[in-house]
Structures are given as C-alpha cells and as structure tokens.
Amino acid sequence: MDDYVFAPPERVSVKVLETKKRFAVNRVFCVGRNYAEHAIEMGFHPNRDKPFYFTNSPSAVIPSGSRICYPEATDNFHHEMELVIAIGYGGSKILPYRALSHIFGYACGLDMTRRDLQISLRERGYPW
C-alpha cells in the first residue's frame, strides 16, 4: 500500500442500467450558455455571448435517488436538467460522421447551482 499524505478520492462510477456493470467517471466536461432561451433568461444574448466550456469534479456526480442538502448561505439554489453524454473512448480530430461511435451512452443529469453566489461573482468579474 502506498503511503499517501492525503487519502486519494474513491473512484466515482455510475450504474449502467439493465446490467451489473458500472461506468467509471474520470472527467466531467460541461458546456455553459448552450441553450439560447436559457441564455436570454440569464441576461445574455445568444448571438453575442457564445457558449463556454468548463470542467467539474467527478466527485460532483452522485447516484440517482441520492439526497441533496440545501446549502447554507443561499437564497437561490437553482436546478437545471442536463443531457449527459458518456464518452466510451476518446480521440482527437474526430470526423463528424464518426463522432457517435465514440459515445457509450446517454443519461439525464441534475445540475444544482447556488445562483445568487454565481450572479454575485459574475457581477464582480470572478469565475463561478
């Protein structure tokens, strides 16, 4: 056994429906401002303010049916339904007609955001 200064995080995985297998979550890539109607709701213009990309920790992935605690110091804990695409294997410079062959499967995700904190940071020019 290795002698870690800090214990490494447990491997995050999700159950693959109708099997006994699990899908390991290595990285979480996200796209923000990718739905025009929602961008407008958030005060952005879809033709001017382009989508952006960010990552999230695999530890943010929790199993379906898990309890989510309402965080302290927020008055606006906002939910959004997300389309989750599980990548089966990677690559680079993938031709559009081959892209679907890299997808393992799809799922629904629930993105929870402290919207009041997000807006406050955005107004001060900070990343959220």
PLM ranges: what are they?
Residues 1-128:
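Catalytic-core "active-site belt" of small-molecule-metabolizing enzymes
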